[in-house]
């Protein structure tokens, strides 16, 4: 019971309390999107005493129009994967997630920091999906690159690789977009919505792959490139999840959670002030409506 209460408290703090506080903490000393995002995300990791360690020789790449492929474990992905790309992440998410976590996902990630784009699963055609990706790459107003969970679903507790979805790999081939894997172990220990658990003092081990380029002289078709990427993903995944990293933690470099890349994009202050006004108004109006309803019922 205590673990369950701790889980719900953590979810509330991460997705409601801290985003709300951050919205009102921002002032004109924090003018840039990535700085604001960094202060929020790094604070979440510090509150949980979650530490990130790079276990690979390669580091995060910021090649033009790169697409990051990350393993999908739990809601903690959205906090940790922001940090491991040096705050250059733009998540692709089902639109339903915006309804489940409106303050964090829609207002905070999408509106303020341009770190989230949405699609409707089962209702977005492949051409429309590709146009969505292309539009965001051509109109990059935040310096963020696409991050995709190519497994297609959360796989907390499943420590073996699966075949990847083909869509974004095919797109990468057609549009000559490089791909980099960022596979992290232990993300779901920080926050796991399937088991209703949240832990502190978690060590997350992060592996950055080399950058894979869709060389059309080497890969004669989209399917050839897919098969290569799929095989590389499985090999990398097994290497990350098959090793005991805790015993070698002293050999790894700790990732700097405040390091940002390309922090040159400014927060939309009129939008921020509008969000503040809406939150304050809701905090006043909603309780007033509830109280009024109780008064009417008691009459």
Predicted feature descriptions by range:
Residues 1-69, 76-80, 264-275, 287, ...:
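Membrane-anchoring hydrophobic helices of lipid-metabolizing enzymes
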Residues 13-25, 48, 62-123:
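Catalytic core of membrane glycerolipid acyltransferases/transacylases, capturing the structured
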Residues 41-45, 81, 107-110, 171-172, ...:
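Structural element of the ATP-grasp superfamily
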Residues 54, 116-120, 214:
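Short acidic-hydrophobic, aromatic-tinged amphipathic segments that line or gate anion-handling sites
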Residues 58, 123, 185:
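Residue-level "edge-of-site" marker
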Residues 61, 126-127, 188-189:
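Short secondary-structure capping/turn micro-motifs that flank functional sites
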Residues 125-133:
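Structural motif
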Residues 132-299:
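Non-catalytic C-terminal accessory region of glycerolipid acyltransferases
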């Amino acid at each position: 019971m205590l673990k369950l209460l701790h889980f719900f408290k953590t979810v509330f703090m991460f997705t409601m309390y801290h985003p709300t506080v951050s919205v009102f903490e921002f002032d004109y000393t924090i003018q840039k999107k990535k700085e604001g995002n960094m202060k929020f995300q790094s604070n979440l990791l510090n509150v949980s005493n979650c530490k990130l360690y790079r276990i690979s020789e390669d580091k995060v790449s910021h090649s033009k129009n790169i697409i990051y492929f990350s393993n999908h474990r739990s809601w903690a992905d959205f906090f940790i994967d922001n940090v491991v790309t040096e705050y250059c992440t733009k998540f692709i998410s089902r639109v339903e997630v915006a309804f489940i976590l409106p303050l964090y996902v829609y207002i905070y990630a999408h509106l303020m920091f341009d770190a989230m784009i949405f699609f409707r699963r089962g209702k977005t055609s492949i051409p429309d999906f590709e146009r969505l990706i292309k539009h965001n790459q051509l109109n990059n107003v935040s310096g963020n690159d696409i991050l995709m969970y190519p497994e297609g679903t959360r796989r907390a507790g499943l420590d073996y690789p699966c075949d990847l979805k083909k869509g974004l790999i095919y797109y990468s081939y057609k549009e000559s977009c490089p791909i980099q894997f960022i596979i992290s172990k232990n993300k779901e220990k920080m926050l796991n919505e399937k088991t209703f658990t949240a832990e502190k003092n978690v060590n997350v081990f992060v592996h950055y792959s080399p950058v894979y380029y869709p060389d059309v002289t080497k890969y004669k078709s989209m399917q050839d490139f897919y098969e290569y990427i799929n095989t590389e993903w499985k090999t990398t995944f097994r290497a990350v999840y098959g090793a005991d990293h805790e015993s070698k933690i002293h050999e790894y470099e700790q990732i700097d959670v405040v390091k940002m890349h390309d922090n040159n994009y400014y927060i939309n202050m009129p939008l921020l002030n509008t969000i503040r006004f809406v939150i304050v108004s809701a905090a006043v109006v909603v309780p007033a409506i509830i109280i009024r309803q109780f008064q009417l019922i008691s009459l």
